[in-house]
């Protein structure tokens, strides 16, 4: 339901961002840019207990938002069903520890097509190159594929399971 999605997105995005503030090593966010880039440097060590606790808290908070919005559990059920598309577990197949994973790249709609996403992507690529890292990311929007291909990303695979949603898994090898 588009109306439910519109109401839930700010809540779920806020919850995700709270989790990322706690668990991500590199973070770019700016009201001036009206854009956000969240990445995870997979070479960095982390406190597993803190990571799992933060992730559990975020999952519980997301679930509560979904149930509050739709007490029938229909939205919650669909969210659970789509779980395969809402994570980066596919990256385990890469067997690559020197990797930067792009979790979020978003630009406010009124600032799109002004080069903000390209500027943030250039910065992520620069960091990865300096550290000899592969970059991985996923997108659910087929229209984004052309943008990523401009940065030498290649399609690693496509996840498609229970419904029409596809997850495009992309990598950029260290060059």
Regions found by a protein language model. Give the residues of each.
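Conserved acyl-donor/pantetheine-binding loop and adjacent beta-alpha core of acyl/acetyltransferases
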Residues: 36-104
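Hydrophobic, well-ordered beta-alpha structural blocks that scaffold small-molecule cofactor pockets
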Residues: 83-90, 123, 127, 150
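Conserved active-site alpha-helix within GNAT-family acetyltransferase domains
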Residues: 118, 130-132, 141-158, 162
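Conserved beta-hairpin
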Residues: 22-40
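Conserved acetyl-CoA-binding loop-helix of GNAT-fold acetyltransferases
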Residues: 104-107, 113-126
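Active-site rim helix/loop that mediates acceptor-substrate recognition in acyltransferases
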Residues: 2-25
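Conserved beta-strand-loop-alpha-helix junction that forms the acyl-donor binding cleft
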Residues: 103-112, 136-145, 162-165, 172-174
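Conserved GNAT acetyl-CoA-binding A-motif
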Residues: 99-100, 127-140
């Amino acid at each position: 339901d588009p109306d439910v999605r519109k109401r839930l997105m700010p809540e779920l995005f806020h919850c995700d961002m709270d989790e990322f503030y706690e668990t991500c090593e590199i973070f770019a966010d700016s009201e001036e840019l009206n854009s956000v880039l969240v990445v995870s440097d997979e070479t960095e060590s982390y406190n597993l207990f803190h990571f799992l606790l933060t992730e559990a808290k975020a999952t519980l908070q997301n679930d509560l938002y979904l149930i509050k919005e739709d007490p029938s559990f229909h939205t919650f059920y669909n969210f659970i069903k789509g779980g395969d598309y809402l994570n980066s577990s596919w990256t385990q197949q890469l067997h690559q520890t020197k990797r930067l994973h792009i979790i979020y790249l978003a630009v406010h709609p009124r600032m799109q097509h002004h080069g903000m996403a390209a500027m943030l992507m250039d910065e992520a690529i620069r960091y990865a190159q300096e550290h000899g890292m592969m970059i991985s990311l996923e997108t659910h929007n087929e229209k984004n594929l052309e943008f990523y291909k401009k940065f030498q990303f290649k399609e690693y695979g496509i996840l498609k399971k229970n419904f029409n949603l596809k997850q495009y898994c992309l990598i950029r090898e260290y060059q």
